């Protein structure tokens, strides 16, 4: 074995060890966080906690209204944000060319980097102030605005992965461009688009700042979209900054529920990404 081979083996061993160390540190930190949340929250977690509404300071009460409110907000934001994001992504991939397409792409990239609290303030100015009250609708719009650029960019990238031979074959058969896009390209990219949608939902499910300016929060179960609505993130925030130990314990339990929700969404994403073109 000459010196060159020895140097290569040493370099390979060093890089392999460094990669393994980084992996252990990243996974270890995640496991520590998850374990600590589970340890702190499991004591207050029970069935009544999941279905009851909050009570004044003391024993009892739950996060049933916050769970339902979070689901309403996620559903509302998905109804608004997912179709819009997919349409923007299809435009950028299949149609958008020239300066206008570049401008749309620039706007989408800019929206991706805007802090969520800025989005909340924007929706507060255009919806909450004219309506003169907080509402679930405003919260859903704020989350949808955060969701759109994520879905748009993911959709664009997934559509670009579709082989050009599929497009060319459909066009050669005489199909118009719009039918090729709807009937060939989008179905081929559907697993990737669904993955992007789930990632966007997971992303907005942990948002707090925009909801403080829009949905605000409530101690009651939601009945309409035109009233303030509770959410897990806002309730965790309110309980965490309170001076009461009982609310601190419930904040940990609510965090465990939220973490389980996000992990469940990520598992679904992993299952969807197993499919390939």
Where are these regions (language model features)?
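Hydrophobic positions within alpha-helical transmembrane segments of bacterial inner-membrane proteins
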Residues: 28, 70, 74, 78-90, ...
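Transmembrane alpha-helices
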Residues: 155, 177-214
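C-terminal transmembrane helix and the adjacent membrane-cytosol boundary/short C-terminal tail
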Residues: 14, 156-160, 171, 195-198, ...
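Amphipathic cytosolic juxtamembrane alpha-helices at the membrane-cytosol interface
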Residues: 84, 88, 92, 97-101, ...
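Periplasmic/extracellular loop-to-transmembrane helix junction in inner-membrane transport proteins
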Residues: 2-21, 36-79, 97, 235-249
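Cytoplasmic-entry segments and transmembrane alpha-helices of multi-pass inner-membrane transporters
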Residues: 17, 84-123, 150-157
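Interhelical loop and adjacent transmembrane-helix boundary motif
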Residues: 54-57, 61, 211-259
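Generic hydrophobic transmembrane alpha-helix motif, especially the helices
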Residues: 109-145
């Amino acid at each position: 074995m000459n010196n060159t081979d020895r140097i290569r083996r040493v370099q390979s061993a060093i890089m392999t060890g460094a990669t393994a160390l980084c992996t252990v540190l990243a996974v270890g930190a995640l496991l520590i966080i998850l374990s600590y949340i589970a340890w702190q929250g499991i004591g207050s977690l029970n069935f009544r906690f999941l279905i009851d509404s909050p009570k004044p300071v003391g024993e009892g009460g739950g996060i049933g209204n916050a769970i339902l409110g979070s689901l309403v907000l996620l559903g509302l934001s998905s109804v608004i944000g997912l179709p819009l994001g997919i349409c923007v992504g299809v435009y950028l991939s299949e149609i958008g060319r020239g300066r206008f397409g570049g401008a749309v792409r620039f706007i989408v990239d800019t929206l991706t980097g805007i802090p969520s609290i800025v989005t909340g303030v924007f929706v507060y100015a255009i919806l909450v102030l004219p309506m003169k009250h907080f509402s679930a609708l405003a919260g859903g719009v704020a989350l949808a605005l955060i969701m759109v650029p994520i879905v748009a960019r993911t959709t664009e990238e997934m559509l670009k992965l579709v082989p050009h031979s599929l497009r060319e074959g459909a066009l050669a058969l005489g199909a118009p461009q719009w039918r090729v896009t709807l009937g060939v390209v989008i179905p081929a990219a559907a697993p990737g688009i669904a993955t992007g949608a789930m990632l966007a939902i997971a992303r907005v499910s942990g948002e707090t700042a925009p909801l403080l300016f829009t949905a605000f929060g409530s101690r009651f179960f939601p009945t309409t979209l035109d009233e303030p609505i509770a959410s897990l993130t806002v309730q965790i925030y309110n309980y965490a900054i309170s001076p009461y130990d009982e609310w601190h314990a419930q904040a940990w339990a609510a965090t465990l529920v939220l973490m389980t929700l996000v992990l469940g969404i990520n598992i679904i994403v992993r299952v969807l990404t197993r499919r390939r073109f």
